[in-house]
C-alpha cells in the first residue's frame, strides 16, 4: 500500500467543493472502498414491489434509488426531510408518477428516547403494504402505524454504534 499523496484535510477541502445534490455521491468514485455485502437492498425491494398497489420510500434523497426501481406501483409516495432534496426528488420522480412529500425527519435512531413522539409521517393508519427506508431515521411505532397488516418494512441502516 502506498502512502497517500494528499492529506486528509486536503481531501476534505476537495470534497467540500463538490456540488451536493440529491443522494448522488458519484464524485467519490475511485476514492473510497467498501466491502461488498452478501445481499442487495435494491434487489430485496424489487422482489417485494411486484404485486403491491403502493409503496412508501422514506427519505428518498434525490430519488435516485427509487427511480432505478421503476416501473413502480401507481400508489408510490416518497418522503424527504432535507429541504434542498425535495425539488430534486420531485423533478426525478414526478415523471414516474411518484408524489414527494416533505417531512420533518425523526431523530437519529440511536438518539431516540423511550416514549418520544409518534414521528411525523402524514399518512393515515395502514396506508402502505410496503415501506422502504434506506439510511433514514424513523420511529418504529410510526412505521407500524402506517404499514398495512401483513405488510413489509425493508430498511438498510448504517452507523458506528448500531
Kindly give the residue locations of the regions a language model identified.
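Conserved alpha-helix/loop element of class I SAM-dependent methyltransferases that forms part
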Residues: 20-27, 32-54, 64-68
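Conserved beta-strand signature within the Rossmann-like core of class I S-adenosyl-L-methionine
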Residues: 150-161
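N-terminal, positively charged/glycine-rich alpha-helical extensions of SAM-dependent methyltransferases
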Residues: 1-26
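A short SAM/SAH-binding and catalytic strip from SAM-dependent methyltransferases
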Residues: 117-119, 127-142, 157-159
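Structural alpha-helical scaffold elements that stabilize or flank donor/cofactor-binding regions
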Residues: 48, 122-124
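A short glycine-rich, Lys/Arg-flanked "PGG" loop and its adjoining helix->strand segment in the class I
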Residues: 138-152
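Class I SAM-dependent methyltransferase SAM/SAH-binding core
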Residues: 54-121
